[in-house]
Structures are given as structure tokens and as C-alpha cells.
Amino acid sequence: MKNKFTIFILYFCLTINLYSDDLFIEAKNITINKSVNTSIFEKDVSIETAHKKITSQFAKYNKNTQIVVLKDSISAVDKLNNTIKSNYAEYNNIKELFKTKGKTTLTTSENYSLDGEDIYFDNKNKIIKSQKSAILKDLSGNKIYFENFEYLINKNIFKSIGLIKITDQYNNTYKFSQIY
């Protein structure tokens, strides 16, 4: 009985370690620096994780922290087809957090388009959010202006508290303090 319990605990611990490093990176040019455990990937970089596929032209991966710094023509697509595009981003493989810096475009699985800045894509909590202003465009041509937002990925719902302005396809304007 003790042996079975020991084997179970050992198996559980080893399984956790195996799944923590499931990051696959490909590129045309690869430079490895073993002394600091970093790798630099250039030209047509492709990264596959358990939850998304990321492409860019440059990536620097730190094996110790499992953080990837991405630059130039970044596109991240999750399994539900939510797409984020930017020119600078960081992906933390341990926390499953993808965050952009600067101008960012988000296209949701429902084909809504959002232009904003500094967007966080949290795979563990299934949330995309930003504390910066953003503009959401729907399929009918309506525009929603947010001071900040939170998008619940599994429910396809946007939430925001603060000044929210909606301009519909007929150019009517509505203002709200919160939206859900």
C-alpha cells in the first residue's frame, strides 16, 4: 500500500514538471546562450503553447523565468479564434499571461474588433482586459468607447466601469457609467 502511494505521489510530481515546459518555438535563425539560459529567435518565429499560437519576427526566451519577449508583427490566436496583434508583447508561460505594450488590435471570436493599448490576455482566468482606453466596433458598425474593459472569453461578454460612449450606426450617441 505504501509503495502504491509513493508511486502515485512521484507520478503526480513528475507530471506537473513535464507540463510546465510545454512551449514549442521555431524560427529561421536561432541563437542560444547557455550561460544565461536564453535563446533568441529571429525571422518567422512561431510559438505554440497549450492554449494559443503566437507568431512574430523576433522572440527572446528565458528558460529560467519561462518568459518570452516578442517584437515586430506579433499575432496571437487562441483556440476560440480570439486574435491579438501588436508590435511588442511578453508571454509568461508559467502564469499563461500574454501582455502587449503599445497599440494593440483585438478581434474576438464573434468578429468584434477592438483597438486599444496594453492588453492582458489571461488564459488561466479566461479574461482579456486593459486599463487603457479602447474602441470596440461590432458587425453593424456601432462603436463603443471604453476607458477600460474586461472581456470574458468563455461568455463573449465585455464589461467596463467608467465613461462609456456608444455611437450607433446612425450616429446617435449614448453615454453610460458602466456596461455589461
Model-predicted regions and their roles:
Residues 7-17:
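Bacterial N-terminal signal peptides
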Residues 19-180:
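N-terminal amphipathic/hydrophobic interface segments
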